[in-house]
Amino acid sequence: MKTVFVNPERCIGCRQCEFACAVAHSRSHDAAIAPFETPRPRSRIHVGTGTTYNTSFPNKCRHCDPAPCVEVCPTSSMHRDRERAVVLADGHKCIACAMCAMVCPFDVITFHSAANGAPPRVVATKCDGCVERVSSGEIPACVEACKAGALVFGDLNELIAAGCARETSAMLTSATAALATREPDGVAGWRAWGASATHVNEEVRHGKP
């Protein structure tokens, strides 16, 4: 199963993924025209503030299985496409009850007027995995726009394995660096005592009491 994998440590907060997503879900699919369409196309990926200073995090639907939004939707607007392994929102069935948004653990479901042919009213909007692009052999718009490598498209198991290998390597590197610079217990105290003793010896040598 292919999916979009997020590397938050590589996100630079440029928000190019947001713009590319909005254009991909516009009527014109043209970056020069899409911003002026009515209703204005909206991004389904959102770059937010990270957990540490000066960091960003691209947040998008994880297409959970089972998906809480699918389980609570009273009209089956939220449904899973088993063939393509994505959770989709059918704007024609959506009644904007917001049950899906309330149970979404990642807070990625928003409500906007549909811009790509769905009913001209506010409906639930979320990432659809760029199913049309992927079906035609392209990669998701957000991944194509990301030049920092924060978004990667590929087989889920392979991406997880690569991510685990990267994290393990980082942990080993950090641990080695920490061990190389760590002093044995008590050394700091001995160094302080030595400095004091040297100071006293210098005073005695120069005839100071």
Which role fits each region the language model picked out?
Residues 2-4, 57, 85, 123:
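Short amphipathic alpha-helical segments
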Residues 8, 75, 91:
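Aromatic-flanked redox-active Cys/Sec active sites in thiol-based oxidoreductases
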Residues 22-25, 74, 105:
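Protein kinase-like catalytic domain
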Residues 83-95:
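Active-site cradle of extracellular carbohydrate-active enzymes
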